């Protein structure tokens, strides 16, 4: 893999310990480093560059950030060239366009529409380089390419962020603007070109789907994803294997549940951040969010109202009851800090063996 890992920066949590033979990139995101415009002195340690579990550059500088998209792309292309004779899996997780933004000289100012657009042009170039490498080595028809994202835009950054329109809100919320992202797949001969699907799937479904395609045994531990290949392949009559999906955020808050087919979404009472219609910031400095409270559950029919403008809970009490029951199943297994539920299936967080633990202060 190459790019942003963001699943822990100590050795037990790095890619070599989690199935990757090769890895190169940064352990967390761009805003978690001393060079962020709003970072206070001492808030973050230096951002290192790590290769195969070893630090090769203790402090990535802004100048090096400008070259990172190019370097990650080159890694992906070289990996394809070296492994063209055997099956492979490569995960390319570009840090951009996460703020703060950086772009190489070859794309700086090229879009004519600002830094964010320049960054997107460079990422478009990167995708083209990877697809070109597959084409050169005759691998196009043998390779499933998946292009997707982890969340919606960070709206407070304004001209250094994207747009979630027509969806509501953005990153850091359970509204569609925060959770619904693009997913494009290419596999000539297996996936029809130009086809679209309105079926609802989640990133958690990728692992079991890919495992099923290559005939790999299912993981022995319990996972929440399901094999959704029949849906992706457009097989007639294919339906979701999920009863529904849960959207947790913050300190394990179950903020919304969605029916398995994506028809209905019940947003549960919680506090969330919003710009309240105000514009985002400029030049990499974010605008301030305000916090509002959703006092009662709100139901939206996503098939006709993806913008979540009209609460139809009063018109469909039976749907509300069904999704509330599903939410209770979610809480029973994975907990919910909003309702102070622990959850029978909650695992302990990863810890470093021998690391000191925080002691609670004595009262009195």
Model-derived regions: residue spans:
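Beta-strand elements within well-structured catalytic alpha/beta cores of enzymes
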Residues: 76, 87-93, 120, 127, ...
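Short, solvent-exposed turn/loop segments enriched in Gly/Ser/Thr/Pro and often Arg
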Residues: 1-13, 27-29, 91-100, 147-155, ...
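A structural signal for well-ordered alpha-helical segments within the folded catalytic domains
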Residues: 18, 70-74, 121-128, 201-208, ...
């Amino acid at each position: 893999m190459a790019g942003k890992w963001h699943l822990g920066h100590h050795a037990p949590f790095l890619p070599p310990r989690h199935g990757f033979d090769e890895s190169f990139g940064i352990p967390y995101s761009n805003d978690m480093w001393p060079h962020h415009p709003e970072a206070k002195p001492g808030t973050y340690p230096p951002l290192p560059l790590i290769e195969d579990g070893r630090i090769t550059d203790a402090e990535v500088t802004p100048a090096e950030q400008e070259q990172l998209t190019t370097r990650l792309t080159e890694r992906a292309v070289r990996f394809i060239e070296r492994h063209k004779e055997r099956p492979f899996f490569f995960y390319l997780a570009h840090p951009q366009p996460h703020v703060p933004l950086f772009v190489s000289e070859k794309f700086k100012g090229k879009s004519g529409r600002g830094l964010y657009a320049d960054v997107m042009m460079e990422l478009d170039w990167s995708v083209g380089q990877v697809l070109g490498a597959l084409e050169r080595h005759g691998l196009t028809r043998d390779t499933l390419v998946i292009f997707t994202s982890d969340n919606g835009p960070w709206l407070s950054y304004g001209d250094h962020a994207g747009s979630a329109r027509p969806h509501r809100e953005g990153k850091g919320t359970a509204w569609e603007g925060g959770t619904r992202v693009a997913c494009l797949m290419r596999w000539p001969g297996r996936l029809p070109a130009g086809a679209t699907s309105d079926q609802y799937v989640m990133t958690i479904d990728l692992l079991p789907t890919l495992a099923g395609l290559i005939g790999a045994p299912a993981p022995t531990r319990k996972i929440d994803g399901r094999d959704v290949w029949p849906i992706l392949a457009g097989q007639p009559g294919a339906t979701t294997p999920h009863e529904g999906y849960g959207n947790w955020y913050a300190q394990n808050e179950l903020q919304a549940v969605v029916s398995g087919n994506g028809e209905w979404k019940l947003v549960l009472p919680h506090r969330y951040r919003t710009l309240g219609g105000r514009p985002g910031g400029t030049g990499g400095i974010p605008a301030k969010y305000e916090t509002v409270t959703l006092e009662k559950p709100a139901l939206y029919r996503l098939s006709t109202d993806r913008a979540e403008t009209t609460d139809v809970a009063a018109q469909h009490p039976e749907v509300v009851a069904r999704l509330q029951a599903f939410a209770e199943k979610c809480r029973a297994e994975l907990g919910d800090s909003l309702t102070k539920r622990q959850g029978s299936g909650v695992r302990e967080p990863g810890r470093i063996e021998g690391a000191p633990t925080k002691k609670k202060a004595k009262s009195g």
